[in-house]
């Protein structure tokens, strides 16, 4: 499990340097160490509106993000504070405090727009902080929302049906939370009490009228409702009436703060801790700290090069890095587990291959967990190839350990025989039979040696081969035997040697068969796990489409109630297209199976070792694999 990050205070994540947004290497290093999923809360708003105070509260500290006490904006760029999530185990809460919008000292007014867009792209909960009330002026100050269609793209290429790219924003935008500070109104509408959320809902209702001023005023309202999947509101009383204390509110004791403000702050923090979502990308891909760091770099590279930050492009860059790391992680897992579970030499090759199958299954699962968007299975092919080579290395280590052990045991068992040969003990009448008995005793004792491993017969055969010339010499010098008896003995020795050779050949053929069957099982496992992953990805895709549809239907109903026919018709067209997309995806013949077979074929043949890459053999194995997939209970290769 990833260790928790304990930062004593925030660090700068991005800053504007000479007209370029630059990422801080220290912040990237911190993010790269976070392998847990992250909940990212970003706060944006006009300078000197108390954004930093709320973020410090979320961090559980009075101080951290600089509050400042003058009309000058204190926070520059985007600052980051990573803390263990207080209510989601094994998650990290990342707080992003942003440079105050509208600071007149800024040389580049576009900087505000990019900070706003980055906060949207990086967060799972986007907090907009303002003062007073949500009125016409407050909505005008939120004009940055209307610029998002120019600053963010979902797809790298325009859609062929000419549908606005922004129609997909809701599938990856964060939840929108409006915090209203120093709120002095009563929460009432037409004389009836209303909730904070109802207050925001009413403020975001479109205004009737055709003139450009009204239409411009409606833009932020319309796009907050369209782009952000959920809207939430919190209002806060003034924290303290004493102006001097207010200037240093971070140093004021809790019991000196307004009781309503304390309760409102607690409610806000509680909501964030329990409802702020884990950061995800399209199709439910979880974002870790490491992935967030890569996203920051990718988005800033796009901005600084004059391009528009694009989610699809960012995910492609992320996939390349993460999938490569997933291959390494899976391969390391395989090596570690094999090293822990295998004791060399194994009694049989099958024993080693059985452990290999278990470790390989786990390694593939590791790869599937950490990889995404491996469309052509490029990285899965690399994993297959890597594990095939590692398996061959373990097979070789097993053979070497067996050979070394067996040779040592035979040397020990044959010491007396060697000494007797040197002393000429067997070069006497009847010496051949004495020699045969001594050799047989060595073979019998060798048979009783435990865990000799896969090279046991081969090493024995090599030993027996080394005795052929000696035995022939002893036989010929044995005067107790007639010429006929010597001929029969020589023939018997050759027959036994031939039988041993045949037995050794059969063992090698059996081991080749076991290796082939292990490869077949290996690729069945790859295909089975790939199939499950593709099905999960398809489910996530369908879930995403249905969530988009549900959100758009909700907005459509509201527009119908409010009587905005033009916007209603435009959104209705979007909804109809989305329904068609969902219907097409649901009715689509599950082509997953055929895709898997195609992929399996290319992976399987590409990873076959040496001579097995011959076309006939490769096609035979592929055919066997496909048949087995279609007939899971039937044994194909025999």
From Swiss-Prot:
Top EC class of this enzyme: hydrolase
Region ranges (Interaction with the CYBA-CYBB complex): 311-638
Catalytic activity line of the entry: GTP + H2O = GDP + phosphate + H(+); GDP + H2O = GMP + phosphate + H(+)
Region called GTPase domain (Globular), residue ranges: 1-310
Sorted UniProt keywords: Antimicrobial, Antiviral defense, Cytoplasmic vesicle, GTP-binding, Hydrolase, Immunity, Innate immunity, Membrane, Nucleotide-binding
Location in the cell: Cytoplasmic vesicle membrane
PROSITE patterns (alphabetical): G_GB1_RHD3
PANTHER family per the UniProt record, alphabetical: GUANYLATE BINDING PROTEIN
Function: Interferon (IFN)-inducible GTPase that plays important roles in innate immunity against a diverse range of bacterial, viral and protozoan pathogens. Hydrolyzes GTP to GMP in two consecutive cleavage reactions and predominantly uses GTP and not GDP or GMP as the substrate. Following infection, recruited to the pathogen-containing vacuoles or vacuole-escaped bacteria and acts as a positive regulator of inflammasome assembly by promoting the release of inflammasome ligands from bacteria. Acts by promoting lysis of pathogen-containing vacuoles, releasing pathogens into the cytosol.
Descriptive protein name: Guanylate-binding protein 7
Organism of derivation: Homo sapiens (Human)
Gene designation: GBP7
């Amino acid at each position: 499990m990833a260790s928790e990050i304990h930062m004593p205070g925030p660090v700068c994540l991005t800053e504007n340097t000479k007209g370029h947004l630059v990422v801080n290497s220290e912040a990237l290093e911190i993010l790269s160490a976070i392998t847990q999923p992250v909940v990212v809360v970003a706060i944006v708003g006009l300078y000197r509106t108390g954004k930093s105070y709320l973020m410090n509260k979320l961090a559980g500290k009075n101080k951290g993000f600089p509050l400042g006490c003058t009309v000058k904006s204190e926070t520059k760029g985007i600052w980051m504070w990573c803390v263990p999530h207080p209510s989601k185990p094994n998650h990290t809460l990342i707080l992003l405090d942003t440079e105050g919008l509208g600071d007149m000292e800024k040389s580049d007014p576009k900087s505000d727009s990019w900070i706003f867009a980055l906060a949207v792209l990086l967060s799972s909960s986007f907090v907009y902080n303002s003062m007073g009330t949500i009125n016409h002026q407050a909505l005008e100050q939120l004009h940055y929302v209307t610029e998002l269609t120019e600053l963010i793209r979902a797809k790298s290429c325009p859609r062929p049906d000419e549908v606005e790219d922004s129609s997909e924003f809701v599938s990856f935008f964060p939840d929108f939370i409006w915090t209203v500070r120093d709120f002095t109104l009563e929460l009432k509408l037409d004389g009836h009490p209303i909730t904070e959320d109802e207050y925001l809902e009413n403020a975001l209702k479109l205004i009737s009228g055709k003139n450009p001023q009204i239409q411009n005023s409606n833009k932020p309202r319309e796009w907050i409702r369209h782009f952000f999947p959920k809207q939430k509101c919190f209002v806060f009383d003034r924290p303290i009436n004493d102006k001097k204390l207010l200037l240093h509110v971070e140093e004021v004791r809790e019991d000196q703060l307004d009781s309503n403000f304390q309760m409102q702050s607690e409610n806000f923090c509680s909501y964030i801790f329990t409802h702020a979502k884990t950061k995800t990308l399209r199709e439910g891909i979880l974002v870790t700290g490491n992935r967030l760091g890569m996203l920051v770099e990718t988005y800033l590279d796009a901005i600084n090069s004059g391009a528009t930050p694009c989610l699809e492009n960012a995910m492609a860059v992320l996939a390349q890095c993460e999938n490569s790391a997933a291959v390494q992680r899976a391969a390391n897992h395989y090596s570690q587990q094999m090293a822990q579970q295998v004791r060399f030499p194994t009694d049989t090759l099958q024993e080693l291959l059985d452990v290999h199958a278990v470790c390989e299954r786990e390694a593939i699962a590791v790869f599937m967990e950490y990889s995404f968007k491996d469309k052509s299975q490029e990285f899965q092919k690399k994993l297959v190839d890597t594990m095939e080579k590692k398996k061959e290395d373990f097979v070789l280590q097993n053979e070497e350990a067996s050979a070394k052990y067996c040779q040592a045991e035979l040397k020990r068992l044959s010491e007396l025989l060697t000494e007797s040969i040197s002393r000429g003990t067997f070069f006497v009448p009847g010496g051949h039979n004495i020699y045969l008995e001594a050799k047989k005793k060595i073979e019998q004792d060798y048979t009783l040696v435990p865990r000799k491993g896969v090279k046991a017969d081969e090493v024995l055969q090599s030993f027996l081969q080394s005795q052929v010339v000696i035995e022939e010499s002893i036989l010929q010098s044995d005067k107790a035997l007639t010429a006929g008896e010597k001929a029969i003995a020589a023939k018997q020795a050759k027959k036994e040697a031939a039988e041993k050779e045949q037995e050794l050949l059969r063992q090698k053929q059996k081991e080749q068969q076991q290796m082939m069957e292990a490869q077949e099982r290996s690729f069945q496992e790859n295909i089975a796990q790939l199939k499950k992953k593709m099905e999960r990805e398809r489910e996530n895709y369908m879930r995403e489409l249905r969530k988009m549809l549900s959100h758009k239907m909700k907005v459509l109903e509201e527009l119908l109630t409010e009587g905005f026919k033009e916007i209603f018709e435009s959104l209705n067209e979007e909804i109809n297209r989305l329904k068609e997309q969902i219907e097409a995806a649901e009715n689509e013949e599950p082509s997953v199976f055929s895709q898997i077979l195609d992929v399996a074929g290319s992976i399987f043949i590409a990873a076959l070792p040496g001579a097995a890459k011959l076309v006939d053999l490769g096609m035979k194995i592929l055919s066997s694999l496909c048949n087995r997939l279609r007939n899971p209970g039937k044994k194909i290769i025999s």
